[in-house]
Amino acid sequence: MPFGLSAGSTRSEDGSEAFLEGMVDWELSRLQRQCKVMEDERRAYSKEVHQRINKQLEEIQRLEGVRHKLRVQISIAQSQVRRLRDSERLESMGHLLKCQVRVQAEVKELQAQNQALDREIQEWESRNSAHSKNARSPGCVQHDKVKSQRRIKSLENQLDKVICRFDIQLAQNATLREELDLLRIERNRYLNVDRKLQKEIQLLKDSVRNLMVSSTSAYTVREEAKAKLGMLRERAEKEVAQNETEVQILQRQIAHLEQLHHFLKLKNGDRQPDSAIVEKREQRAREVAEGLRKTSQEKLVLRYEDALNKLSQMTGESDPDLLVEKYLELEERNFAEFNFINEQNSELEHLQEEIKEMQEALVSGRRSEEDRRAQQEQQRAELQQRVDDVHSEADDLEARYHNFREQLEKLKTNIQHLFTRAQCDSTLINDLLGIKTHMRDRDISLFLSLIEKRLVQLLTVQAFLETQVVVMFNAALMVLGQSSEDFPKKVAPPQPPDNLEDPPGFEAKDDYPLSKEELLSSVMKAEQHLKELVESIKVESTPSMTSSTQKVSSSSRLVTQRPSQVPGSIMSHRTSGILVSSGGRATSSNVGHVTFGDSSATTGGLMSSRGSIPGRVTFRSPNSSSYLGSTGYVGSSRDHDSFEASKGPGSESSGGLGSSPGPASSPGPASSTGQASSTSKDSQSNY
């Protein structure tokens, strides 16, 4: 018996070692599979990393090339800008130096001429003193006096010409300064617009750069997600295939174990009792009933013998040692199979749980992928909607731009048509802009300013023509000694505005350009002011109503006692009102070129001559010489000339209607009326 027990134990140890070796082999195969999977993952990850590094290197090289190009462009732009600025500054400095040298030369020339004139004046004064010492005959003295006066007049004329030339140069300098100011303003505007556009371009570049960075990052993230998703799919497919094979193997093993378990159950079930055994039991029972009892030892032996017989009958083996060994071997095998079945059941449950988790993970991954796709579709739809909205808005803006452009072109054509219909002076525009067939957008204000000036001139002429009849009627009443209070009063014509002689391109800050209502209101205010002035003149002239001569002399004294007033002129009250309103100065901004003569008033002043036609008024268009009259040089020279002429023996200073009668004077109302028509014709022809 002890030997049988040791043999059974060795067999059980061999079975456990075989089981452990099987477990080790299975674990080794599992670890090898896991190692292969990890090796595949490592290769995929290394490949992905290499691709990402290559992409980043390519992007770095491209950005380096872009940076090099931008640096080259920036250096070129800076050099060009500097050269342009230097060339512009050199040109402006050269032009200014040339202007300075020319003006200095002209100033020196004028100073030399003034010195020469001073020397001649001193010589003539010394000659006059010498002639006065040498008492000659009255005829010689008169002849010398006439010669000296002629010489003085010629010198004064030369001085006036030089001063006019100097004034012309000053006016040209002023116009050039204004042009430079306008060009400087345009340059500043252009630089501001250029700076704004550069800022917008920089902002757009920054936004494009940010969008590129975000798009590249989103692309890399998308590629990474795609790679990970592909790896997960491959891994899931491999694991699913592996799990399916393992499940099939386990299912086969489970079916085999179930069959074995069923077989063992059937084998261990209750059997039918043997008839011999039943007879022996009945015989034993009869013997016990009869009282034939055996000892316990005998009973135990008999029991063992019966059991051994049963086992020998069941197994067909009569050797008890072999029976024990077979029994132990069967028990160990059953125990090992029981343990194996328990382990397989536990591992099957674990695998089923893992399969369930993997299925849930796959379902959640598919759901998240569907959600992500739905979100991407929604974002794509929103972006498409925004793009459509932006396109529609851009089309609307383009249509509005074309509409406004058409309106602007129509406005420019209408302005040009109005410019030609109004017969505006286009010499200033040709001088500034050159002869062009089309109008630029920035030239509209210049055309409108010239049209407005022409409109003011036409309104002035219209008011003058409307009030001419009333003025002649009032002059006739004053000559006849009557007053115009019983008659309806007419509004005096408006005086021309101060900006008629403004240079081209001049633009006032507050009230320029005026609208139609503002222009009418300003004209009405000027008429009201002139009306008050005329009434004040009439009030001052009422005490001296004794004769028409005293009336005309009192009205002529209002013109700061100028001897150039023509006797019997119908326009005496008109010119006196204008001169009084301007403070006694007949400037070119408030009085046009009023000529009471033929050619003696070439400088624009008010002069009278013996051969002039009294009452003839000529309004000339303002030019550069009339604009220069506002500087004070020409006016002073003309005033001095007219004053000297009034003192001379041959001058005709009219003190009233009765002075220096001749063919040129017509002191009657009829003559004044007749010459008023010539005045209106001359004014219309000049305009």
Curated annotation (Swiss-Prot):
UniProt keyword annotation of Cytoplasm present: yes
Record keywords: Cell projection, Cilium, Coiled coil, Cytoplasm, Cytoskeleton, Phosphoprotein
GO biological process: cilium movement; outer dynein arm assembly
Coiled-coil zones: 100-193, 222-267, 341-421
Gene Ontology CC terms: axoneme; outer dynein arm docking complex
Compositionally skewed regions (Basic and acidic residues) per UniProt: 366-388
Pfam families linked: ODAD1_CC
Tissue: Expressed in trachea multiciliated cells.
Biased composition annotated in UniProt, kind: Low complexity: 544-556, 660-680
UniProt feature, compositional bias: Polar residues: 557-611, 620-629
Source organism superkingdom: Eukaryota
Subcellular location: Cytoplasm, Cytoskeleton, Cilium axoneme
Keyword Plastid: no
Main location per the UniProt record: cytoplasm
Region (Disordered): 126-147, 363-388, 487-511, 540-687
Function, as annotated: Component of the outer dynein arm-docking complex (ODA-DC) that mediates outer dynein arms (ODA) binding onto the doublet microtubule. Involved in mediating assembly of both ODAs and their axonemal docking complex onto ciliary microtubules.
Oligomeric and partner information: Component of the outer dynein arm-docking complex along with ODAD2, ODAD3, ODAD4 and CLXN. Interacts with ODAD3. Interacts with ODAD4; this interaction may facilitate the recruitment and/or attachment of outer dynein arm docking complex proteins, including ODAD1, ODAD3, and ODAD4 to ciliary axonemes. Interacts with DNAH9. Interacts with MNS1. Interacts with PIERCE1 and PIERCE2; the interactions link the outer dynein arms docking complex (ODA-DC) to the internal microtubule inner proteins (MIP) in cilium axoneme.
Family: Belongs to the ODA1/DCC2 family.
Protein name (record): Outer dynein arm-docking complex subunit 1
Species this protein is from: Bos taurus (Bovine)
